Amino acid sequence: MALPVVYGGPGRYVQGPGELSRQGRYLSWLGDSAYVLFDQGTKDRLFKQIVDGFQDDNLREPFFKIYNGPCTEAAVVEMAKEAQAEYCDMVVGIGGGKMLDIAKAVAHFAELPLCVCPTAASMDGPCSAISVLYHEDGSFDRYLMLEKNPDLVVVDTDVVAAAPLRMTVAGMGDALATYFEARSCVAARGTNEHGGTPGHLALVAAHACYDTLMECGVAAKRDLKKGRMSPAVERLIECNILLSGVGFESGGLALAHAIANGLTILPECGAMHGEAVAFGLVVQLRLERAPELAEVLEFCQ
């Protein structure tokens, strides 16, 4: 029997400048008492905006949790128990990819609604129903498949644009693979990350990633270098986080991500996730003898 077409995505996605300080208006949809996760670096840079974001009459004082360790199953289960013990009714994760994976897993094990606030456009995980778990030594453990996508994703483009340029460029590498991996899944009659068949909407979102990168990627990088917000930067952030997130999850993954995950066991690798995915994509396209290989190589350089 043929598998059904299955799509997934966040309950609501909000993107714009200054939204971290205004997230309370959205969080009140989920509950009134938040278990808020971030690391020390995020606290040092953004604590005022974080606190301002909870100045809403419908919210109680949040429980702030600073965590700097790896996203291991033992750690997230312990934090889930803490969230329940503090009578929190939602989880909020603020930070980069690792912190958002932690927040997703905590919400999963605590069975609570989830809001994620990415502080960089370094990967396409914020919108997904997947949390990547690692061993204590930082090597890849497994994908934790969640029951649902985040209920709310809040992207403050002022914060994301201020992140180190390398992080945004790494996110471009992650998004670059989205279309080609989805295309491979369709060609092989494979399944997507929801266990269903990739449908037309998934391919449209995935192809939009590639088109956006080719149209706006270079200009957005140039603007970010100059510290300038622009329509190209806004489109790139949406591409890296939303389009690629929906595209990879509903379209499926292939060799590019398999290679990237394998590289995590090599301590000398030192690459960010999106950088490793871009390398894996080049290998995938070479093996497929894909006509886009030259264009992809030129873009990566």
List PLM regions with ranges.
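ATP/NTP phosphate-donor binding region
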Residues: 1-90
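Solvent-exposed alpha-helices and their adjacent loops that cap or buttress functional pockets
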Residues: 5-7, 28-29, 84-86, 107, ...
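A glycine/threonine-rich phosphate-anchoring loop and its flanking beta-alpha core
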Residues: 11, 108-201
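Structural motif
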Residues: 12, 34-35, 89-92, 113-115, ...
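Short glycine/serine/threonine-rich phosphate/pyrophosphate-binding segments
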Residues: 20, 43-47, 73, 98-105, ...
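A short, small-residue-rich loop immediately preceding and capping a beta-strand
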Residues: 83-119
